[in-house]
From Swiss-Prot:
Domain of life per record: Eukaryota
Entry-linked SMART domains: KOW (SM00739)
Entry protein name: Large ribosomal subunit protein uL24c
Assembly mode: Part of the 50S ribosomal subunit.
Keyword match Chloroplast: yes
Coiled coil location: none
Keywords, ordered alphabetically: Chloroplast, Plastid, Ribonucleoprotein, Ribosomal protein, RNA-binding, rRNA-binding
Organism: Pyropia yezoensis (Susabi-nori)
SUPFAM superfamilies, per the entry: Translation proteins SH3-like domain
Organism ancestry: Eukaryota, Rhodophyta, Bangiophyceae, Bangiales, Bangiaceae
Oxidoreductase listed as a keyword: no
Length: 116
């Protein structure tokens, strides 16, 4: 087995990859950009660095221990993020092209910029 399936429960393929630069297009963090840290294929969500921060209060477990406040990135649905071009400051959908060697390369539709 190769690893986790790239499709979700409803068989939609996630076109984003770990390390992609994305912009949030809806919600409280709208227009913020960040890098994808993780992809959760089962729920069709991504975790973006520094975006959708949530706070968790942890109680002390033992006597003499202090409680703490933990900040963490919560997952965002893939429909709420879009690939982002840093050169042109534009969010865009992606398409796949096949080069001369037969390799698949992702490309931004609005700018034509190739994605690594």
């Amino acid at each position: 087995m190769k690893g986790p399936s790239k499709t979700t429960k409803n068989n939609t393929k996630i076109k984003l990859k770990k390390g992609d630069l994305v912009q949030v297009i809806s919600g409280s963090d709208k227009t913020k950009t960040g890098e994808i840290i993780a992809i959760i294929y089962k729920t069709n969500k991504v975790i973006v660095k520094g975006i959708n921060l949530k706070v968790k209060h942890k109680k002390p477990q033992q006597e003499g221990e202090t409680g703490e406040i933990i900040k963490f990135e919560a997952p965002i649905h893939t429909s709420n993020v879009m690939l982002f071009s840093e050169q042109n400051n534009i969010a865009s959908r992606s398409s796949v092209i096949i080069n001369d060697k037969g390799q698949k390369i992702r490309k931004l539709k609005k700018t034509g910029e190739l994605i690594k």
